[in-house]
Amino acid sequence: MQSRALSRLRSYYKRSSVFPSSDNDRSVQLFNLVRSIYSSSSRPRVPQPEWLIGELCKVGKIAEARKLFDGLPERDVVTWTHVITGYIKLGDMREARELFDRVDSRKNVVTWTAMVSGYLRSKQLSIAEMLFQEMPERNVVSWNTMIDGYAQSGRIDKALELFDEMPERNIVSWNSMVKALVQRGRIDEAMNLFERMPRRDVVSWTAMVDGLAKNGKVDEARRLFDCMPERNIISWNAMITGYAQNNRIDEADQLFQVMPERDFASWNTMITGFIRNREMNKACGLFDRMPEKNVISWTTMITGYVENKENEEALNVFSKMLRDGSVKPNVGTYVSILSACSDLAGLVEGQQIHQLISKSVHQKNEIVTSALLNMYSKSGELIAARKMFDNGLVCQRDLISWNSMIAVYAHHGHGKEAIEMYNQMRKHGFKPSAVTYLNLLFACSHAGLVEKGMEFFKDLVRDESLPLREEHYTCLVDLCGRAGRLKDVTNFINCDDARLSRSFYGAILSACNVHNEVSIAKEVVKKVLETGSDDAGTYVLMSNIYAANGKREEAAEMRMKMKEKGLKKQPGCSWVKVGKQNHLFVVGDKSHPQFEALDSILSDLRNKMRKNKNVTSDAEEAEFLVI
């Protein structure tokens, strides 16, 4: 004869609609367990419905758990807490609170703590505080939960205050406070607390090692690491990461070589460290030796090659990743490889990657679609970029995506199309941002739409909610400078609100040099010198402007002032990549092994330029680059 519990179970589980149909689902496995009870001839061990409710809540099947819960004739506090916790895990605090309030006097400290934790997880700190204060009793877990909530919200002092009030503490309490202080960079306080700990475990030691290393105190971190009574792989990784992040890659490598075991984080940290140190060969060698690679490993290598402008190598690694097939690209992978395609103007490769993205879960990701727009833009495929935008392939038409499309047109000199895109954006109810205006000014500048650009700048000035950045002023200079209307900029030179830097004034002076605007240049130089800025570039530019306009005495005077102040112009430099080798050239430097041949070629070019009257001033003659 079957037990009473089995009879109760049968009434609940005959309604198979309670459960979903997926065989891979743990809830179905639970259902199959119950079915086996009915088919068993021997007397089975019957799981209680309360147990099944708890299991369903653990796997997120709250709807099924709730149906079973509502059908129970009697419920104990454990079952109530299971269902409340199930709702909390899904972020449904409204339903969790409704059940919590129904429990009344039956709820225990576990139920209360679960609710406090739920409100903290949902960023409702004030409600969590009130609930914590209302608790009829608290245990150490309750205190730890609230302390961690304060710490995660950045209220470290409040967390410390609560920590001091605790009637009893366990090692989790101490570790939580140490980690919280470390994360906020309050290392001395963390160390003081660490030294006061009655007992330390590997988590305590690792938190301090990690905190010291991340705050630049690598040697102190190493001394602590060496004193650890026991270490786990997280401890080793913390120390290696500390060395790598502080540009001490050789020491990181030495430690890496003697690790008793390594995980993905160990290998990936070292690869990242070598890449940051511009040692791509070592990074590649380590990557090839990895026993197993995850998506971070592949993405790190791809990103490293992109950052080092070795875009073809990045594409090769991406191809190997696809052939390997053990992991799928993530958002970071796609963004990096699309950046490589953009730099190479590799439209075919970019289109192939677009096809992969369209079949992945990332096809609507905002960052990925923005990278696709950028790739099509740099490849000159404006129609493809616009098609993506118009056909809804961009995840959502928010301000970022509108700005991206305006930038696409702006950077290709399609000023009118950029403005039309802006007008459509306004019709859709979007308010322009500072970035929007920057793109519009750039578009107008490169399309020669001076009046329209000036209108946009005035709109920006009138909108007090938006910051006026240096880049806006620099774009304005470029806009007016290209049209030979630098006088329109002078009104902004004396504007008190315009926090302008040397690069802004340098842009005006460069434009004055092109358009021979001596009077405006003098006004700008006066303003620069009034700010107390003594920059060699200012004197050199003004000297060149004087020289270009035949004012040799004034030019010589500027050079003399520069000399009296002990200012020297930073030597110009440039570099070119031939094959896989970078060649650096600095003004006045003759150390390059092919200097004589290069100097001869440049001299021939210089003579041809003179014959074609391409050299326009004595100033330019003096500034001629000598390798």
Curated annotation (Swiss-Prot):
PPR repeats: 45-75, 76-110, 111-138, 139-173, 174-200, 201-235, 236-262, 263-293, 294-328, 330-360, 365-396, 398-432, 433-467, 469-499
Gene Ontology terms: biological process: RNA modification
A GO cellular component annotation in the UniProt record: mitochondrion
This protein's UniProt keywords: Mitochondrion, Repeat, Transit peptide
Ranges where the record places region Type E(+) motif: 580-610
Region (Type E motif): 504-579
Gene Ontology MF terms in the entry: RNA binding
InterPro entries assigned: E_motif, Pentatricopeptide_rpt, PPR_At4g14850-like_plant, TPR-like_helical_dom_sf
SUPFAM superfamilies on file: TPR-like
PROSITE patterns on file: PPR
Pfam families according to UniProt: E_motif, PPR, PPR_2
Compartments it resides in: Mitochondrion
Transit peptide: 1-44
NCBIfam families to which the protein is assigned, alphabetical: PPR (TIGR00756)
Family note: Belongs to the PPR family. PCMP-E subfamily.
Annotated protein name in UniProt: Pentatricopeptide repeat-containing protein At2g35030, mitochondrial
Organism: Arabidopsis thaliana
